[in-house]
Structures are given as structure tokens and as C-alpha cells.
Curated annotation (Swiss-Prot):
Keywords: Host cell junction, Host-virus interaction, Hydrolase, Inhibition of host innate immune response by virus, Protease, Serine protease, Suppressor of RNA silencing, Transport, Viral immunoevasion, Viral movement protein. This is P3N-PIPO polyprotein. Potyviral RNA is expressed as two polyproteins which undergo post-translational proteolytic processing. Genome polyprotein is processed by NIa-pro, P1 and HC-pro proteinases resulting in the production of at least ten individual proteins. P3N-PIPO is cleaved by P1 and HC-pro proteinases resulting in the production of three individual proteins. The P1 proteinase and the HC-pro cleave only their respective C-termini autocatalytically. One of its GO terms (molecular function) is serine-type peptidase activity. It holds the Pfam family Peptidase_S30. The lineage of its organism: Viruses, Riboviria, Orthornavirae, Pisuviricota, Stelpaviricetes. The N-terminus of helper component proteinase is involved in interaction with stylets. The central part is involved in interaction with virions and the C-terminus is involved in cell-to cell movement of the virus. GO terms for cellular component: host cell plasmodesma. Its EC number is 3.4.21.-, 3.4.22.45. Belongs to the potyviridae P3N-PIPO polyprotein family. A motif (Involved in virions binding and aphid transmission) lies at residues 621-623. Transmembrane segments: none annotated. Residues 173-313 form the Peptidase S30 domain. InterPro entries: HC-pro, HC_PRO_CPD_dom, HC_PRO_CPD_sf, Pept_S30_P1_potyvir, Potyvirid-P3.
Length: 996
């Protein structure tokens, strides 16, 4: 019969057929203990469990490796897992918990870092074996299994000794008092000594406690968030700071505080539970004043949901500002040497502080963080530019501040710190000149220019480098000043020769008479061509008074001709040896001549042994002699026999003919006729009056080509007047005026050197007479030739530089432009000399601009602006025309005058020559009218090619059918054009009315 064993109870299983008919009862068959199956525990060794644990660990590791390999092979899944792992849990706006995920870049960096770390770990620790041993020990009591527990201790097991730990007894700080007593004692000390106390809570919750004196009592005040501009629902936690607030109430007395005393500035006051305001407005034992709302005082310990409903009682902004101002002002104040008084009002002081604050830290609001960050993000150059712009925009406020002289130094400092280098054009020009040059001096100039370009932005290192380079350049320049500097002239010596010049023509016996005097022969006969035309006869019976003063355009000089009347009194005779001295000029660069960097001593002024210039003394006169010999004692040659009974003196402007007479001494007799005819017919018309020394030297060179024997001829004495830039050729009548420099040139060969263009000398441009008269005559010829085409064509052909003299007046330029003289000059010279043609092009363009300007000052400014360009072109042109030097001087004067006036205008000084310009323009207009009055109307019209262009400008073409109307319009146009300046609008309108 089947049965089921439940423990020690056997339950028989009844067949289903019997269960329906047989009545069963509660029968239980008890099985004997011997028949019950016993479940004995299986005894297994330690190695079995070790093997089983290793197997389970291996299976777990394989499953984990399979899972890791799955995630490692899928980069997207790896990225998501790493990003979630790095995410932080954050509370969302609706109270939900969300993940604050990092940026993708940080996640990728983390993944790459982990890969690198794993690879390094495999390389460094290859010996490490990871094994997991799991020991499972089933412990059964002896009563249940009857088997003793097996021990895993080895026979070498030994129990280690237990080390006793030394107990460190901390000294109790508060031995006899509680924590509350400690707080009270600390707060009392802080109250008495006015020390702020920092109260630190959890995380960032911290407040500063100070004690205020109110009505003779101390009140505790804690700092709150709204005082820093931060709004919070609960500004102070009572749970964290409750015991400290109660301690504050114990050491303060707040009974004197009333409701009406709570005003702005009371924020943070601490009131205890015994105060009536605490009992009225607070649900907590303490009241920390935050402000007021509609219901009354607001407690900072309690939550506030709407910030706008609360009127916070923090200190007033001006009070807070003044507290910070006073604190830092006192920290930075200098040491005082006097007792300060209140001499200025608070409003004025506030304005001054605001001006200086905005000058150095320009912001819209000092409390704005964006304004401060905006200034911190810009570079130093941009910050300085913003200060300069701010300085310019508020110039009126700065000008009002300048009225007080106490602020001048501060204004200069601020303005100097914000100024930038404006004239970058000059700096760029310097860089153009020195770039690509590797010499030491060019690099030094680059360093100096780089420092100057930066202006106030230059650093101290750059400034030190620039000063060092400047010092080296100065030392180098000082050692090489012998080229142009005055220091080199201190060592210049050009002593007079102690030996007399030997003239072979005067030593030949065949040319001397029995008295040893020179015999002119045929030379004397042909010299009449010079004496009759260019010399004036002196009649002794009429006296010598009118010949004493020798006039030249730049001044006067006294001759010693009056000393021909010799007194027999010794004292009076000695007075004839005394001269009249002019202002003596020192030795300058104008006294020397150089070529290829070397001095040409024969073309320089004579000096003494100490280097000072040799000044001329009285030159005694003689009768009927030709005096030659510049060095040593002079030689006296009798005049030709035909002229022996007469006395001659050269006319004004022709004293250079004495040089040609001295050359005539060395000319062969059979060639004397050709020599004198060339002088009279060719050279004198070309030289004219008062030619330059360069022109005279060129003429001597021409004569030397045809008559080579004249090159060794001795020259007359030549004195140099640097003040008037004049060369005085001394004849037999000497000179009573003394103090001139002496030219060392003694022969014609020496004189010819002045004709070289390579010779660097100012004296070669000196006139043997003067320049103003020459320039005035050229201007008169120019004005006369404006309306005379033949004369103008002759001027353009012979001396094109004369047109540059028209720049003295805008009226002359406009008239030459109307008559198309510039066009003729361009057509004539564009192929012959490109530089001269360029001058005419510039003059034509300049005149167009001048014609469009109505004011005289503006016209003169345009002319001055064009002068530097013309001056640069003129220096590269040939200087063999007589108008070259006057034109060059005119341009130089205009350039220098413009530069000087520019400096004066910048410094605020007016130009006082305006009246002079107006009067000069009126005189030129009168001169033009005077010259045109001499010409006939038919000549004015028929010789003017510009008449058709003038008619086109002022109106329509003349109707050929109406002769009377044609004559009337013709006369009106000619009168307007020839007598008035046609460049003004008034003249345009007059001509239009005349045409109608």
C-alpha cells in the first residue's frame, strides 16, 4: 500500500475507488525510528569547495566580460553609459530629479583617458593574477552532525601580539563652563572691542555679526543677503544659528528700540523674545529685521514669497557708497603737513571725484558687472583709445575744469597718457626709407622710429633701447661732422699763401718796356670795346664824392677813391688807413666748397692760423691801373697807352669785367680782337648785370677753350660778402669798407671750378652784385610778356624758369593760364627737357585750382602747398639760366614761410602778413593794367589764342551776322579779361550781363 512520509509520519494513499464507498477515519500509522530514512550530510573536502568557488567565479567573470565586450564594441552605448556615469543629479524646476549631463567633449576625453590608463596598467603589472577564492565553510554544531570542525590553520600558525594604542587625552578648553557661557564671553569681547564675528553654518551659509551703538545701548546686527543685492526667501536659518542669536540677545539691550525707530539702515538688527516687536511680528523666539510690508516688520528668519512686497531696510545707497569711499580714501591718503579745512562744498567735491573716476574707468554704472567685464576684455590699446574718445566727447566739461589751476597737472597727466601717435604718415615715410637696409645706423633708426610710433604705449625696455641707439648714432655723427657740421669747421684751415703767384706773361722781357711795365700793344687798342661801352669815365676835376658809395641791389660799399686826395698832414694821412667795418661774419659752412667729400681750398675763404676767417682791410686806391693778384702782394699794371690819360670805373653790375681785363693780359696780341669781340657780343649779353659767380666762371671757361693761355691768368682781388651773398671784384680804387671775407682763388683755373655742378658750395650762387633787382626785372618782363606772345615765346625759349616767378601772385598765374602760355611751354619743352615740361604741367594744374578759389588767402595757401614739389623738381634741373636762382630762392622762401606759419598757427599765433599780401596783389594788378594800357585793342585780341575759349566760357558763340553786337561783346570781354581777375564769380556774372 502506497504511503507518503512527512517527517516521521507515514500517510497511506487510498485508492480512488475505495474513497467513494469506504468510510475513512483519522488513522495515523506511527513508523518506527528504525524505518525512517536519515539524510546524512555529505562530507566533501576543502579542495572541492575551492574548485567550485573558482568555477563559479570564472563563470561570473565570463558573463561580465561578455557584457563588457558588448558595451565596448558599441561606441554609442559606451558613450551613453559614460555620460550617465558622469552626470550629476539635480532638482528640476517642478521638483523632479533630473540628470545634469556633461558636455560631449568632456565625455570623449574621459573615454580616451580610461583607454590609456588600462593600456598602461597591462604593461606595468603583467605579473598580477586576479583570482578569487571563495571559502564556504558550513559549520554545524556537534550536536547536529556529530562531526568536529576541521581547522584551516597551518602548522606554522602563530598568533601575533596585540599592540596597545596610546590614548591621547585632549585638553578640555572649556573646563568650568558650558558652550553658552563660551559664546557669551566671546560676544562680549567682540562687543567691547568692536570686532566683527563670522558665523558659519552649513555649506555656504555664513553671516557677519557686528555691534551698533543705538541710544547708548549695543544692538547686534547680522549681514543679510539683500544687502549684497541677492534676494532669497529665507535669508537666515534659525535652525543653524538659533543658539547664536539667543546668545546675541543675552549680551545686548534692545529695550530702547521702538517701532518708529525701525527705518532704512536697520536691516539685520537682532531682537530677543522678550521684545514687544518680536512678540508682535515673529513666530520664532528671535526677530532679525529684514524690512516692512503691508502687515508690518518682516522677519529674515521666516520665508517671504514675494520680494517686491517687502521694503528692505538695508542702508541707503549713498550711505553705502560713502562708507566704501571713506574707507579706501583714508587708506590711500598721503601724509599731511598741514591742518585740513573745509574750503569746498560737497557737491563740488563729488563732481571732481566723478570726473576723475570716469576719466580712468568710464562705465555707465559702477555697480554693473557687465560694464566692468567689458573694460576687462579689451586690450590696453583699445582701452586707451576709449579714454581718448571719452576725453574728446566731453571736451566742454574738461575745459570748465581747466579754469581751476589746481587741476593742471592732473589734466596733463590724463591727456598725455591717452594721447596716441597721430602723425603716422611721417613714421611710415621713415620706415620706407630705412627698410631693407641692414646697416647698423639704419637699424638704429628703425628702433628709434618704432619707439616713437608707439607714443605713450612704449614700454620702458623699448624706451631704453631707443635711447641707447640714439646715443650710439650721436657718437657716430659727432665723429663724422667734418662733412657738414660746424664742429668740423673748427679744424678747417685755409691759410693764405706766403708766396706770390708767378705770371709768365709779366716776366717775359719782350712784353715789358724799359721801365719794366707791361706793354699792351694790340691788346690795348682792342680793349676800347670794353672801356667805351661798359665803363664810366671818372673826371677828377668834378671830384670823387659821387663815386665813393658803390651801390648794389643788396646794399652799398664805399670805395677808397676819396683817398686819392692825399693830405700832407701826417695825422690826417693816417686816418686814410682806417676803414668802415661791416658786421663780421664767423666761419660757417657757406665759406667752404666741397667735392666728393673733400675741401676745394682754392674755392674757400681764407682763414688765419687759429681757424678764424681772414677779414679784409682797407684797399688803397691808385690811378689808371689794373690791379691783379689775389694772394700775396698785388701787382699793378698800367692801363693801355691810349687810355693812360683817363680814369675809368666799371658801371654798376659790370664789375666782373675786371676779370676779363686781367685775362686779356695773357691773350696773344693777334687774338685780342677775337677775344674782346666775344666778350662784347656774346658773353656780356648772356651775363647781363650782376650775374652769379657760377655764370662768370662758366664764361671764363668758354674763353679758356678759345684762348687756353688765359687759364693761368691772375685774378683781381675778390671779397666775399656773406650777409648780402655778393662777390665784390676790387678794382684800382680799392675799398674803404672792411670786414669782408677773402676768396682764395688766384687764377682763372681756380675760378673755373665754380662752374662745376658737382661742386657743393653756396658761394657759386652768389651774385657779382645782387639778386633782388634781377628778380624784379624778371618779374616785369614776365608781366610784360603775358599779353605779348612774341616776347613770351622768347622768354620760354631762352629762360623757361621765369614762369615760376608768376607764383608771387595768383593774378599772374590766372592770366598766363587764360593766354595758354603753360600749354605752349609744355609743347616746347616736353621733348627737350622732361623735368622742365613737368614744371609747366604742375603750374597749369595749380592755376586751375587757384581759379576756382575766391579768397586770396586760400589761393596763396594752394601756391605754398605746391612749392615743395616744384622745389624738388628744380633741384634736378640745369641751372644755366639766369632765372634759375631767383626761382629757386622764391620757392625756398615759400616753403620755409609755410613751415614757419604752420608752427605759429598750431601754437595759436595769427599770420600778420595778410595786409602785406593784399597790398602786393593790388600793386601787381596795377602793373598788369599799366602794361596792358600800352597795347592796342586789336593787338590784345588778335594775338590771344585763348579768345575762343573765353567766349565759350562766358556765353554762346558770337553771332557773325551782327557786327555791332560782336564789337560790343568783344570789347566787354577784353576789358574784363585784361583788367580784372576772371577767376571770381563776380567777374563771371559781370561778363554775362555785358554779353546780354
Amino acid at each position: 500500500m502506497a504511503a507518503i512520509m512527512i517527517g516521521s509520519i507515514s500517510v497511506p494513499i487510498v485508492e480512488s475507488a475505495r474513497c467513494a464507498t469506504v468510510q475513512t477515519g483519522n488513522r495515523v500509522n506511527i513508523v518506527a525510528p528504525g524505518h525512517v530514512a536519515v539524510c546524512k550530510p555529505q562530507m566533501k573536502s576543502h579542495s572541492y569547495y575551492k574548485h567550485a568557488s573558482e568555477k563559479l567565479s570564472k563563470q561570473a567573470s565570463e558573463s561580465i566580460n561578455i557584457l563588457n565586450s558588448f558595451f565596448d564594441t558599441d561606441p554609442e552605448m559606451r558613450f551613453r553609459l559614460t555620460r550617465n556615469e558622469m552626470s550629476k543629479v539635480k532638482k528640476g524646476p517642478n521638483g523632479r530629479m533630473i540628470l545634469r549631463k556633461p558636455r560631449a567633449q568632456r565625455v570623449l576625453e574621459r573615454i580616451s583617458f580610461e583607454k590609456i590608463e588600462k593600456g598602461a596598467e597591462r604593461q606595468v603589472l603583467p605579473w598580477r593574477v586576479y583570482a578569487t577564492v571563495t571559502s564556504i565553510i558550513n559549520t554545524f554544531t556537534d550536536e547536529r552532525n556529530g562531526i568536529a570542525n576541521s581547522s584551516l590553520r597551518s602548522p606554522f600558525y602563530k598568533r601575533s601580539c596585540r599592540k596597545e594604542k596610546k590614548k591621547i587625552v585632549c585638553e578640555n578648553v572649556v573646563r568650568s563652563a558650558s558652550v553658552n557661557n563660551l559664546c557669551d564671553r566671546v560676544l562680549k569681547i567682540a562687543r567691547e572691542k568692536n570686532i566683527p564675528v563670522e558665523m558659519i553654518g552649513k555649506k555656504k551659509n555664513r553671516h557677519t555679526l557686528t555691534f551698533k551703538n543705538f541710544k547708548g545701548s549695543f544692538i547686534g546686527k547680522v549681514s543679510l543677503a539683500h544687502e549684497r543685492g541677492q534676494m532669497r526667501h529665507v535669508e537666515m536659518s534659525y535652525e543653524q544659528f538659533g543658539f547664536i542669536l539667543q546668545a546675541i540677545c543675552r549680551v545686548t539691550n534692545t529695550r530702547c528700540v521702538r517701532d518708529e525707530d525701525i527705518k532704512p539702515g536697520c536691516s539685520g538688527w537682532v531682537l530677543g523674545d522678550d521684545h514687544e516687536l518680536t512678540q508682535k511680528f515673529s513666530r520664532l523666539p528671535c526677530l532679525v529685521i529684514r524690512g516692512r510690508d503691508d502687515e508690518g516688520i518682516v522677519n529674515a528668519l521666516e520665508p517671504v514669497f514675494f520680494y517686491d512686497d517687502v521694503d528692505h531696510y538695508s542702508s541707503q545707497p549713498e550711505v553705502q557708497f560713502f562708507q566704501g569711499w571713506r574707507r579706501m580714501f583714508d587708506n590711500f591718503k598721503p601724509s599731511s603737513d598741514h591742518v585740513c579745512k573745509v574750503d569746498h562744498g560737497n557737491e563740488e567735491c563729488g563732481e571732481l571725484a566723478a570726473i576723475f573716476s570716469q576719466a580712468l574707468f568710464p562705465v555707465v554704472k559702477l555697480s554693473c558687472q557687465t560694464c566692468r567685464e567689458k573694460l576687462s576684455r579689451v586690450s590696453f590699446e583699445e582701452f586707451k583709445d576709449s579714454l581718448a574718445i571719452n576725453f574728446t566727447v566731453h571736451k566742454s566739461e574738461w575745459d570748465s575744469l581747466k579754469e581751476n589751476p589746481h587741476h593742471d597737472n592732473v589734466l596733463k597727466l590724463i591727456k598725455g597718457a591717452t594721447q596716441a601717435t597721430q602723425n603716422l604718415k611721417l613714421s611710415s615715410e621713415v620706415m620706407k626709407l630705412v627698410q631693407n637696409h641692414t646697416s647698423t645706423h639704419m637699424k638704429q633708426i628703425q628702433d628709434i622710429n618704432r619707439a616713437l610710433m608707439k607714443g605713450s604705449l612704449v614700454t620702458q625696455d623699448e624706451l631704453d633701447l631707443a635711447l641707447k641707439q640714439l646715443l650710439e648714432m650721436t657718437q657716430w655723427f659727432k665723429n663724422h661732422m667734418h662733412l657738414t657740421g660746424e664742429e668740423a669747421l673748427k679744424t678747417f684751415r685755409n691759410k693764405r699763401s706766403s708766396k706770390a703767384m708767378i705770371n709768365p706773361s709779366l716776366l717775359c722781357d719782350n712784353q715789358l718796356d724799359k721801365n719794366g711795365n707791361f706793354v699792351w700793344g694790340e691788346r690795348g687798342y682792342h680793349s676800347k670795346r670794353l672801356f667805351k661801352n661798359f665803363f664810366e669815365e671818372v673826371i677828377p676835376s668834378e671830384g670823387y664824392t659821387k663815386y665813393i658809395v658803390r651801390n648794389f641791389p643788396n646794399g652799398t660799399r664805399k670805395l677808397a677813391i676819396g683817398s686819392l686826395i692825399v693830405p700832407l698832414n701826417l695825422d690826417r694821412a693816417r686816418t686814410a688807413l682806417l676803414g668802415e667795418s661791416i658786421e663780421k661774419e664767423p666761419l660757417t659752412s657757406a665759406c667752404v666748397s666741397q667735392q666728393n667729400g673733400n675741401y676745394i681750398h682754392s674755392c674757400c675763404c681764407v682763414t688765419m692760423d687759429d681757424g678764424t676767417p681772414m677779414y679784409s682791410d682797407v684797399k688803397s686806391p691808385t690811378k689808371r691801373h689794373l690791379v691783379i693778384g689775389a694772394s700775396g702782394d698785388p701787382k699793378y699794371i698800367d692801363l693801355p697807352a691810349s687810355e693812360a690819360d683817363r680814369m675809368y670805373i666799371a658801371k654798376e653790375g659790370y664789375c666782373y669785367l675786371n676779370i676779363f681785363l686781367a685775362m686779356l693780359v695773357n691773350v696773344n696780341e693777334n687774338e685780342a680782337k677775337d677775344f674782346t669781340k666775344m666778350i662784347r657780343d656774346v658773353l656780356i649779353p648772356m651775363l647781363g648785370q650782376w650775374p652769379s659767380l657760377m655764370d662768370v666762371a662758366t664764361a671764363a671757361y668758354i674763353l679758356g677753350v678759345f684762348h687756353p693761355e688765359t687759364r693761368c691768368a691772375e685774378l683781381p682781388r675778390i671779397l666775399v660778402d656773406h650777409a648780402t651773398q655778393t662777390m665784390h671784384v676790387i678794382d684800382s680804387y680799392g675799398s674803404l669798407t672792411v670786414g669782408y671775407h677773402v676768396l682764395k682763388a688766384g687764377t682763372v683755373n681756380h675760378l673755373i671750378q665754380f662752374a662745376s655742378n658737382d661742386l657743393q658750395s653756396e658761394m657759386k650762387h652768389y651774385r657779382v652784385g645782387g639778386t633782388p633787382t634781377q628778380r624784379i626785372k624778371l618779374e616785369e618782363q614776365l608781366i610784360k610778356g603775358i599779353f605779348k606772345p612774341k616776347l613770351m615765346m622768347q622768354l620760354l625759349q631762352d629762360d623757361p624758369y621765369v614762369l615760376i616767378l608768376g607764383m608771387v601772385s595768383p593774378t599772374i598765374l590766372v592770366h598766363m593760364y587764360r593766354m595758354r602760355h603753360f600749354e605752349r611751354g609744355i609743347e616746347m619743352w616736353i621733348k627737350r627737357d622732361h623735368e622742365v615740361g613737368k614744371i609747366f604741367v604742375i603750374l597749369e594744374q595749380l592755376t586751375r585750382k587757384v581759379a576756382l578759389t575766391e579768397v586770396l588767402v586760400d589761393q596763396l595757401d594752394l601756391i605754398s602747398e605746391a612749392s615743395p614739389h616744384l622745389l624738388e623738381i628744380m633741384k634736378g634741373c640745369q641751372d644755366n639760366q639766369r632765372a634759375y636762382v631767383p626761382a629757386l630762392d622764391l620757392l625756398t622762401v615759400q616753403v620755409e614761410r609755410e613751415f614757419s606759419n604752420k608752427e605759429l598757427k598750431v601754437n595759436g599765433y595769427p599770420d600778420l602778413q595778410q595786409t602785406l599780401y593784399d597790398m602786393r596783389e593790388k600793386n601787381i594788378c596795377k602793373a598788369i593794367a599799366r602794361f596792358m594800357a600800352r597795347a592796342k585793342l586789336a593787338g590784345k585780341i588778335m594775338c590771344n589764342r585763348a579768345i575762343e575759349a573765353i567766349l565759350d566760357f562766358y556765353g554762346e558763340k558770337i553771332d557773325p551776322a551782327s557786327k555791332r553786337r560782336k564789337a560790343r561783346i568783344f570789347a566787354a570781354i577784353c576789358s574784363r579779361v585784361l583788367y580784372h581777375d576772371p577767376s571770381t564769380c563776380k567777374e563771371h556774372s559781370r561778363c554775362r550781363h555785358a554779353q546780354i
